[in-house]
Amino acid sequence: MKKLVLALTAAAAFTGSAIAADLPARTYSKAPAPVAYAPSWTGCYVGGGGGYGLWNQENTFFANGPPRTQITQTTTEGGRGYFGTVQAGCDYQFPAMGTSFVVGAFGDYDFSSLKANVSPLVGGIGQEKMSSAWSVGGRVGWVALPGLLTYFSGGYTEATFDRVNLSSVDLPPTPPTIFFDKRTYKGWFLGAGDEYALNFLPGLFWKTEYRFSEFDAATNVLRTIPTGTPMSTSIDSKNFVHTVRSELTYHFNWGGPVVAKY
């Protein structure tokens, strides 16, 4: 019996070795290389973000007349604050002169809280706030580095400043007695910025832009509180706004995988 067991064990060991020798050798394959993407600015996008802004306002006090007569020298005041923004646009990227250029059009809307205490006339003080702005325009730029667009922008813009209630600067403080209405100013803007493709999520871009806006002067008629009766005086106001904005944008046609050439 012992001899039979030993014989069977030896036979099993020999058979296993023979079968293993007949099997193909195990092959090892490398993990697939990560896919590289070539970002493209051709297509449309949406985005949102925020920023910080400053505004300067030139105010001149007039007697309405006739004839209309300037009462005071022009004074300059200003405010500052934060804002949120949303944007949508479309771009087109094309090769030229050994690099790539981008042209596009866009529109954006800012939810603002840029405010300051102002004294546009002698003896009166109140708080003024730029509460919103919108812009439509275009941009042109070049792909300075792979995935990096440097651009300039410009176009038309409007900004809304809320109603200002003016009270006496004398002590003790008195309730407001006059005001000038909410006003929308019209103007133009110029800007410059960079936009960078975030490779960890294809289609997602990050951009930062400085923008300067100048608005046409507008006449604000002073009115009494509470009746709103127009007074015989008014204020001409002209505004200049500086903003720095940073946004995340998603491009729907963001590019595709880089295909190796042999």
PLM segments and residue spans:
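Gram-negative outer-membrane beta-barrel domains
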Residues: 2-262
